Every structure is written in structure tokens, then in C-alpha cells.
Design a protein with these regions (language model features):
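Phosphate-binding/switch region of NTP-binding enzymes
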Residues: 163-219, 399-459
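Short hydrophobic/aromatic beta-strand immediately N-terminal to the Walker A/P-loop
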Residues: 29-33, 271-275
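Pre-Walker A adenine-sensing motif
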Residues: 9-23, 253-266
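Charged, amphipathic alpha-helical linker segments immediately N-terminal to NTP-binding catalytic cores
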Residues: 1-3, 202-246
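Phosphate-binding/switch loop-helix module in NTP-utilizing enzymes
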Residues: 95-155, 336-395
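Structural recognition of the conserved hydrophobic beta-strand(s) that form the central parallel beta-sheet
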Residues: 59, 127-129, 156-166, 304-305, ...
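Conserved P-loop
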Residues: 31, 35-96, 279-339
Length: 459
């Protein structure tokens, strides 16, 4: 069990562990390639951050000025300890001498800068962003010769040499460097999803070739592999934090990225539908719902759960609420046993039962309900039944959450939803996909804190 807990630390990675092992070698050459907008500059800076190379690095940019880099990546100020420097001043070269503006350099001038660093600095990290701008000004023979010379000097100086390139085809440089990382992106329902391909890492076993990542907050962070065992290893030590003067009756999920995407707050009298790919563990839904319910309790909402869902959450996850008196149950017989021979009568009985149950609560009670659609199969079968159900619960509850674990008319549930969420598995990575109100993708992983499922917007 301990090994599973340890593995959860890799749910969210700065860079892939294989790449991390490679860049910690004493000397190497690395090519980061990919079309424009894939995140090459961000990855090269993230490698600097991973190496904690604050002084002995030399970043040559043929795309942006140092001023632009510090504007685009505000965290660079703290990382390079330049927070008190004004990079707009003329003495920029002295203040942040590790960053060089080479946009107007000729190949000979740039080449001289690099070789000087290789000769004068001990074990430097040198990044050329991008090599294309330099290579395009040289003929093929000069380019091949300069690339070989750089490799020779790099080995002698025990340096780390990193190139970026927009070239999609295999270049002469790719054949002589020690490592090649290729960045790409694709679109999933109007959402861009980024990937990192470990094409070659000399001397390092590559256990996983492709990682998905986000550029949220202008950092590159990769998502680890989905392991269903992690969702069964529940953190029972940390308690739900008591928030002093926590705002009452604010409808939010508690996941900042998700709340920001849907507009800050959940719709009052709204309907959220949640489901998952069939290959995924049921524990994902249960743990996600457990996190949601704990957040609603902190906001002073009362919860009305169907029997099966309540039993699973309270027994398996020991729902960590601050007032169990605010947790109510929809009895199982309410939808199944009293009128087995008459579907219409059975459905009417269910609505009467809920209405009577709700009428017994104080007038100012703010209720959120959580229901599995599977528990309603015997009374909900047609699109009109679903429309009637959704209309009823909208009127009765501040918020309604339906767990879609039945195959009956799923499209109608989608159409009735204000927010539709689905856990999906892509390339071994777990994501939460939001299709309604607008398409978005969130990397989902386990953390050793509360809430235990973490969501990070894929940007």
C-alpha cells in the first residue's frame, strides 16, 4: 500500500520522470521540436527550473527579447532572483546576463557567443531558442559542420546544450543529439490537448513515450498515468479544513479551475450530470462526489442522497462532514416497491414521497440532491419521463446532481443538463471533460490532500 501512496506524488509532474533523469546527466545535447505554439520555449524554461540552474545558464533567444520573456513568464523574476531589477533599463545585459537577445545576430556572431560560454563557464546550461533561425542563414555544409563543432565543444566543456526547432521533418541535428523531445497538440471538441513525445533519450529507459500536459500559469506540467488502485487508497488522516467565516450558500464545486470555467458559481435550481467511461473504476465517481459533498457541507447546504449512494460514500469514504444531521436519505422503497404493477402510479408515488419529505424541512433549508439514475430505472424510461423528472427536481432543490449509471435515454439527460461532466481515459491519462455549458478538459489526479481528486485546466 505504501508504494501506491508514493506513486500518487507523480499525478502531476513538472516534466516527465524519464526526461528529468536525462537532463540531470552531466553533459548532453537535447533537441525540443514541434510546430509553432506547442510549448517549446516553456519546456526549455521548465527544464532550467527543474535543474535549478540560476547562475550557470545562457539562454539565447532568436524569437523574443529578454524583456518579453520576463513579461510572458513572470515566474522567471523569482527564479533568476531578478525581482528587484528593472529589465527595461539599458543595463539589461548586465542585470540579466544569462538571457541574450540574438534576434539580429548573424550566425557567426551567435556561434561565437556559444563557444565563448563553452570555454569560459564551468558545466554551463546553454539553450538556443531557436536553432532554425540560425541554421536558415547557413548552407547545408556549414550547418552540418557547425552542429558537429558544437557537439565536440559541448562534450569537452561537460555542458548541457538544448536546441528548439520548428522543423517537423527529421533534421541533421536530430541524428547527432543525445535526446529528442517532440511536442504536439490536437483538438478534442474544440479543446486543445497538448502532448509530449519522448522520441529519444540516450541512456535512459523510456517507460512511457507520450505524456499530456498543460501550460496553465505559464508552466509546463505533465499528467501522470491513471492507476485505479490510487482511487482506492483513501486519505483518512487529513480532515476537511474548517474555514473561518466561510460564505454560506455559495454554489461552487470547490475546484477553482472548474468553477472559473463555468462562470464562478453553479446555476441555482440547476442540474449537473456526471458519468464516466465504462473502463474506469467506479471509485472515481464516488471520490469525486465525496469531495463535492464535503464542499457543499462547508457552505452550509443540506444533502438529500439516494440510499445506495449514501451507503457507499459514508461506509467506504467515511464522509467527513461537520454535521451529520444535515445528511438525509431518499429511501429505496420510494421508487421501487409500493406500486410494482403500475409504472405511472409508481412514478407519482415517488414524487409525492419526495414532496412530503422536503415539506418536513425548515423553510430556509437549502437542499442539494444526489441521485443515481440506475435507482430510477423502474419509473423513468421515456424522454418525457426524464423531462418530467428534471423539471421536478429543479423546482424542489437548490442544485441537483444525477450520476448517469443507467443506459436509458442518455441523450435526453444530456439535453436537460446545465452542466455535463464525464471522466474519460485518453492515452493512459485521466481527464474530466466538460461538454456543457462550454467544452473544456481538466487533468484529474489524486493528491495527498483534501479534496483528494485534483483538477487542472488543460491550456
Amino acid at each position: 500500500m505504501a508504494s501506491i501512496v508514493n506513486r500518487t506524488n507523480y499525478g502531476f509532474l513538472d516534466i516527465p520522470p524519464e526526461l528529468g533523469e536525462f537532463v540531470r546527466n552531466d553533459t548532453y545535447s537535447l533537441l525540443i521540436k514541434g510546430r509553432s505554439g506547442t510549448g517549446k520555449t516553456t519546456l526549455s524554461l521548465s527544464i532550467l527550473r527543474s535543474l535549478k540552474a540560476r547562475n550557470n545558464f545562457f539562454y539565447i533567444s532568436t524569437r523574443s527579447s529578454p524583456k518579453q520573456l520576463f513579461e510572458h513568464y513572470p515566474w522567471l523574476r523569482k527564479f533568476t532572483k531578478q525581482s528587484n531589477k528593472d529589465i527595461d533599463k539599458e543595463e539589461i545585459g548586465q542585470n540579466i546576463s544569462s538571457f541574450e537577445d540574438a534576434r539580429l545576430d548573424e550566425p557567426e556572431s551567435l556561434f561565437e557567443r556559444v563557444t565563448n560560454q563553452l570555454m569560459d563557464v564551468k558545466n554551463p546550461v546553454i539553450i538556443i531558442d531557436s536553432w532554425d533561425s540560425v541554421a536558415s542563414l547557413m548552407d547545408r555544409e556549414a550547418r552540418l559542420n557547425n552542429e558537429r563543432v558544437l557537439q565536440t565543444w559541448r562534450e569537452r566543456a561537460k555542458a548541457k546544450l538544448i536546441f528548439t526547432s520548428d522543423e517537423s521533418t527529421e533534421s541533421s541535428l536530430e541524428s547527432i543529439v543525445d535526446g529528442v523531445v517532440e511536442l504536439n497538440y490536437e483538438f478534442m471538441d474544440e479543446t486543445r490537448i497538448r502532448s509530449l513525445f519522448l522520441k529519444k533519450l540516450r541512456g535512459v529507459p523510456v517507460k512511457r513515450s507520450i505524456y499530456y500536459f498543460t501550460l496553465k500559469d505559464r508552466f509546463l506540467r505533465c499528467f501522470g498515468s491513471y492507476d485505479p488502485r490510487e482511487f482506492r487508497c483513501i486519505n483518512m488522516k487529513d480532515k476537511i479544513p474548517n474555514v473561518v467565516n466561510s460564505p454560506k450558500h455559495i454554489l461552487q464545486t470547490g475546484y477553482q479551475d472548474l468553477d472559473n470555467h463555468i462562470g464562478g458559481t453553479l446555476p441555482r435550481n440547476g442540474l449537473i450530470t456526471i458519468e464516466k467511461d465504462s473502463i474506469l473504476s467506479n471509485d472515481i465517481i464516488l471520490l469525486f462526489v465525496n469531495d463535492l459533498l464535503n464542499n457543499f457541507f462547508r457552505r452550509h447546504y443540506s444533502l438529500l442522497l439516494d440510499t445506495t449512494m449514501k451507503n457507499e460514500i459514508t461506509q467506504k469514504y467515511r464522509l467527513n462532514i461537520q454535521n451529520n444531521g444535515k445528511l438525509y436519505t431518499i429511501e429505496k422503497h420510494a421508487s421501487s416497491e409500493k406500486y410494482p404493477q403500475n409504472g405511472i402510479k409508481q412514478k407519482d408515488n415517488y414524487y409525492k414521497y419526495l414532496s412530503k419529505l422536503i415539506s418536513g424541512f425548515p423553510e430556509n433549508e437549502k437542499l442539494i440532491t444526489l441521485i443515481e439514475t440506475k435507482s430510477l430505472d423502474n419509473i423513468i424510461s421515456t424522454p418525457s419521463d426524464i423531462e418530467e423528472l428534471c423539471g421536478f427536481i429543479r423546482k424542489k432543490f437548490e442544485l441537483s446532481i444525477l450520476i448517469l449509471n443507467s443506459d436509458v435515454n442518455l441523450e435526453k439527460y444530456y439535453a436537460e443538463s446545465d452542466i455535463y461532466l464525464r471522466f474519460i481515459l485518453k492515452g493512459g491519462t485521466l481527464f474530466l471533460k466538460c461538454s456543457i455549458p462550454a467544452s473544456a478538459l481538466f487533468g484529474a489526479y489524486i493528491a495527498s490532500s483534501v479534496p483528494q481528486i485534483q483538477l487542472d485546466h488543460v491550456l
